[in-house]
Amino acid sequence: MSSLTHLTSHGEAVMVDVSDKAETERVAIAEARVVMRMETLELALSGNAEKGDVVATARIAGIMAAKKTHELIPLCHPLLLTKVGVDLEPDPSLPGFRVQALAKVKGQTGVEMEALTAVSVACLTLYDMLKAVDRFMRIEGIGLLEKQGGKSGSWKREKE
């Protein structure tokens, strides 16, 4: 098992020094689900939710969150993101939304935290905008699906 990169040999927290690492294109994709009642999903898709366009607002919130990841997660490097995308797919079989976020950068460190932050905040925004009608919603399965680039190369989660 690898050692923890954000701790010194004395257990003190540090931001990892990436100055000697090569700049490479890096991509990360994260996913999550928001499970809700079917009536809540229908309301979200109708565009008639009291707080407005639920899907568009959650998408923008996720993108904004990715850009602020370094302000939210201690020791995260600020990155010049080259792309952030958030997709919210309605899934009646849940019922709810399947949410995916993609983050890209040409840099010296990965974008996993940015993709995870984007998907998390998009889900939290769905929850916030719909909680008045459905207090039983659940956010589930937040995780990294895939990463590409950097010294460790590509990684993809196997189907469960």
From Swiss-Prot:
Function: Catalyzes the conversion of (8S)-3',8-cyclo-7,8-dihydroguanosine 5'-triphosphate to cyclic pyranopterin monophosphate (cPMP).
Family, similarity comment: Belongs to the MoaC family.
UniProt cross-references to InterPro entries, sorted A to Z: MoaC (IPR023045), MoaC_bact/euk (IPR047594), MoaC_sf (IPR036522), MoCo_biosynth_MoaA/MoaC (IPR050105), Mopterin_CF_biosynth-C_dom (IPR002820)
Metabolic or biological pathway, per its Swiss-Prot or TrEMBL entry: Cofactor biosynthesis; molybdopterin biosynthesis
UniProt keyword list: Lyase, Molybdenum cofactor biosynthesis
PANTHER family with a match to the protein in the record: MOLYBDOPTERIN COFACTOR SYNTHESIS PROTEIN A
This enzyme's EC code(s): 4.6.1.17
Active site: 128
Entry's Gene Ontology molecular function annotations: cyclic pyranopterin monophosphate synthase activity
Example of a GO biological process term: Mo-molybdopterin cofactor biosynthetic process
Record Pfam families: MoaC
Domain of life: Bacteria
Organism whose genome encodes this protein: Beijerinckia indica subsp. indica (strain ATCC 9039 / DSM 1715 / NCIMB 8712)
Residue sites binding substrate per the record: 75-77, 113-114
Top EC class, one word: lyase
Complex formation: Homohexamer; trimer of dimers.
Protein name, UniProt field: Cyclic pyranopterin monophosphate synthase
Catalytic reaction annotation: (8S)-3',8-cyclo-7,8-dihydroguanosine 5'-triphosphate = cyclic pyranopterin phosphate + diphosphate
